[in-house]
């Protein structure tokens, strides 16, 4: 195996082991409790009321499209990676052995590993905490509940899986788009935290990332046009579509381009920061 690749994978493996063994991972359990309370239980109550089975995949789509949970998930993930990249007494030695850019490439792989692991836990947790049948199509609990109980059409539970979603795209497409866009959202926030850590302003990086999440929450809640300038609106799939009309409000490809451009810019900024990284300042951030 190429030496550079070995160095990159070594960095990624080392960081990932530190990450999954960090006591902070217990906060994921708190997120699962919120998921069950805010999304899974309300959908199961509808299933019981209709006497029909819920699709066990639907709660994940609800979680990934709920304004409350799309706010909580990035916040939980930011808590988990807020200390990264690790700047300890061994960092100088580690970077000198691997090389700056091998070290950074390893950090990128680590981030993808941690994001995928995090989303897999959310997806698996939503399936295990739910009950019903497995199918690749939307269940009648989702598509017909509002017609049978019109007085509940504007309830919080209805907003979890609105008609903008199930009338416009298949369930599997909704799951894949939710996973892809949430992955991009978490990576973007991670790159912001990394950049400010690399220029030795760690606290501002976390503040900047939280501010972006907060701005997304506010603009999405008020349905302001400027919401498309923030990653949160671009992450919530149903916001892209009308309720009935097939024409999208904002094409989904816009959000993929948005994230691609934003991520490329942030990765380039991080590469510049790595190139200018001062080893003598490591002890100051330790």
Feature-to-residue mapping (PLM):
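Aromatic- and glycine-rich beta-strand/loop motifs that create alpha-glucan
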Residues: 1-30
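Central hydrophobic cores of alpha-helical transmembrane segments
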Residues: 28-33, 203-217, 284-286
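Membrane-interface helix-boundary motifs at transmembrane edges
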Residues: 17-20, 101-102, 195-203, 277
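Secretory targeting signals
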Residues: 35-82, 105-198, 233-260
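Hydrophobic/aromatic residues in alpha-helical transmembrane segments
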Residues: 78, 89, 192, 269-270
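Junction motif at the cytosolic side of a transmembrane helix
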Residues: 195-199, 262-286
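Transmembrane helix boundary and interhelical loop/hinge segments in multi-pass membrane proteins
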Residues: 79-96
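Aromatic-anchored segments of alpha-helical transmembrane domains
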Residues: 32-40, 211-222, 237-240
